[in-house]
Amino acid sequence: YTAGVIPSTQYPDNAYVAIYNGTNFNETPVIAKTDKIGYACGRMRSQYYQTIWAADNGDVYVFSPGYGRTAVSSSDLKKVTGQKPSGAMRIKAGATDFDPDYYVNFEEIGTKHPIFRCWHISEDYFLLQLYKKGAEDMINGGTSADVSELAVFKAEDQTIMPVTGLPADGKFGGEPYGEKGYAYMAVTVTTGEKPAFYKI
């Protein structure tokens, strides 16, 4: 930490997306902003995870774990603690701003748990890795929080389907592989069994 440098966002309850016209990153992008969700990224220690994905029709879905709530302020760091729950917003294909009619609060649907990571599977289906014990564990558990829950999110319908049939002590290794509408997730267990791929 360098004195005078703020080590965290001062806007934890806002999400910003830079939209470029074409493939030239030298151009000035249009910045889409929303205050319905917090900043969009997953995180484990110093590694940040992608949580912005496009559906097959070009609509872009922006997912937020609601990590602003984990920031603890102090007089020297001057962090800002967020309040927004885990959620998702949409930018329609070709648009340059968030869809005002689309908002999902993941802590009000399905198992009501915040997301840890997410991946596009096919069409408007996304695989979500969730905090199994809820928002309180995410906020207080840090890197020890239980993230062993999976669900499939159908974005257009705003519905979540829990993934069942996984080992009770299953942990997930890395990122899933997607092909032909299926996600293949590497799963490890603590019972001595060999790791295996599960088809979702």
Question: Where are the predicted features?
Answer:
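Short, conserved, GDST-rich strand-edge loop motifs in beta-rich repeat architectures
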Residues: 1-14, 62-83, 129-145, 189-190
